[in-house]
Each structure stands twice: as C-alpha cells, then as structure tokens.
Amino acid sequence: MKASVFAVILGLVVLCACSFAEDEQDQFVSPNELLKSMFVESRHEFTPEVEGRYCQKWMWTCDSKRACCEGLRCKLWCRKIIG
C-alpha cells in the first residue's frame, strides 16, 4: 500500500516538474544557443532604439523592463524577432 502511494506521489511530482520545465523553457537559453546568438548571428548591425540611442544586439542585456532595441525581443539577450 505504501509503495503504491509513493509511486502515485512520485508520478505527480514528475508530471508537475515536466510541465513547469515546459512553461519556463522560454526563460532559459542553452549554452549552444547563447554562443550562437553572441557570435554566429552577430553581424554588428546597429538598430535604433526608441530613445534615439543605438545598440548592437549581442552586447545589450535586457533591462528590468525587458526592453530591447526596436525589432528585437528579450530572451536573456536582445534577439531578432523571428517570424
């Protein structure tokens, strides 16, 4: 009896952990994707921000308001909007 209760609880914990990982997947970037975004995709293109400043997408981290240059979105670093 105790073993079946333990198995059910363990199954629920694993199910919750998997669903949490799927929800949080957009918040974390794999090391390979991070390196690709910093080096492979960096073409040193300057993009004007709303305030009139200029930035390079690979060198600006997202601020507390998750603001990025125009045409970019926050995903740890400011990255081009795809699609």
Swiss-Prot record:
The keyword Metal-binding appears for this protein: no
Modified residues (Isoleucine amide): 82
UniProt-annotated location(s): Secreted
Residues of the signal peptide: 1-21
Tissue specificity field: Expressed by the venom gland.
GO molecular function, one term: potassium channel regulator activity
Result for mutant: residue 58 to A: 61-fold decrease of binding affinity to Nav1.4/SCN4A
Residues in coiled coil: none
Prodomain positions: 22-53
GO cellular component: extracellular region
Impact reported for residue 59 to A: 49-fold decrease of binding affinity to Nav1.4/SCN4A
UniProt KW Signal keyword: yes
Keywords from the UniProt entry: Amidation, Disulfide bond, Ion channel impairing toxin, Knottin, Neurotoxin, Potassium channel impairing toxin, Secreted, Signal, Toxin, Voltage-gated potassium channel impairing toxin, Voltage-gated sodium channel impairing toxin
Disulfide bonds: 55-69, 62-74, 68-78
Extra facts: Negative results: does not inhibit Kv1.2/KCNA2, Kv1.3/KCNA3, and Kv1.4/KCNA4 channels. Shows an extremely weak inhibition on Kv4.1/KCND1. This analog potently blocks Nav1.7/SCN9A (IC(50)=0.5 nM) by interacting only with its second voltage-sensor domain. It is 30- to 120-fold less active on TTX-sensitive sodium channels, and shows no or very low activity on TTX-resistant sodium channels.
Job of this protein: This gating-modifier toxin shows an important inhibitory activity on sodium channels. It is very active on Nav1.7/SCN9A (IC(50)~0.6 nM), and also shows activity on Nav1.3/SCN3A (IC(50)=292 nM), Nav1.4/SCN4A (IC(50)=2.2-159 nM), and Nav1.5/SCN5A (IC(50)=2.3-2.9 uM). It has also been shown to inhibit tetrodotoxin (TTX)-resistant (IC(50)=27.6 nM) and TTX-sensitive (IC(50)=30.2 nM) sodium channels in rat dorsal root ganglion neurons. Lower inhibitory activity has also been shown on potassium channels: Kv4.2/KCND2 (IC(50)=604.2 nM), Kv4.3/KCND3 (IC(50)=425.1 nM), and Kv2.1/KCNB1 (IC(50)=14.3 uM).
Similarity-based family: Belongs to the neurotoxin 30 (phrixotoxin) family.
Entry text on domains: The presence of a 'disulfide through disulfide knot' structurally defines this protein as a knottin.
Protein name, UniProt field: Beta/kappa-theraphotoxin-Cg2a
